[in-house]
Amino acid sequence: MRPLCAFDLDHTLVRSSLDLVRLKVEIRALVETEGVSLSEATRAWTIGQIIAAATAHRETLGEACWALCTMHEEVAVADASPEPGAHEALSALRAAGYPLAVWTNNTGTIARRALTSCGLDGFFTVLITRDEAALKPDPSGLRLLEAAFPERRIWVVGDSWVDGAAAQAGGAAFIAYGADPVELARRGVAPRTVLRDLRQLPEWLRTAAW
């Protein structure tokens, strides 16, 4: 039985202008403007952690942060294009019998729009978004994938340390794509491999030992 390949969306399957560093700066500024003190140590927090702190301070502030996230995502999806090699890699994996899924921190609406506009929607039978599961690096999305694909091992493919941390926390194997090995190591993420071209993935999986 082939393992499941679960892909992150932005900067893994889809190339877009979504700038998570800029978004994080804007969310921090919004939260601090509303009287929430964020220490220097919180600069290592994920966007989700900052929004959780904002929500604990005031629910409407958390909602404002999520609205800012959605605005950035909607702007980014308008100019989204397939990541180089995505079509070829997914076609080869499907032909080889691998089930395919998407696991993203985006909303379902944005994720479906991005996949459709890039011509990738037909490859996937399951889509896990922040509408269904907590944000990565929380591994709860992995539990949903396991329920959808029982008895299958799972490879998680993504560009960020949060993808790897979520995979590791949930007991899945992580394949990094275009990621910075130094940042992965700093975050305690140990990928099975780091690929620079998605078209390398089918052949790598063919010879990979679990």
What do these predicted ranges mean?
Residues 1-96, 109-112:
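N-terminal helical cap/lid subdomain that shapes the substrate entry/recognition surface
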Residues 1-3, 108, 112-210:
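Asp-based, Mg2+/Mn2+-dependent phosphohydrolase catalytic module
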Residues 80, 102, 154-155:
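Residue-level marker of alpha-helix boundaries and capping positions
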Residues 97-98, 172:
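A short helix->loop->beta-strand "cap" motif at the edges of active sites that frequently abuts
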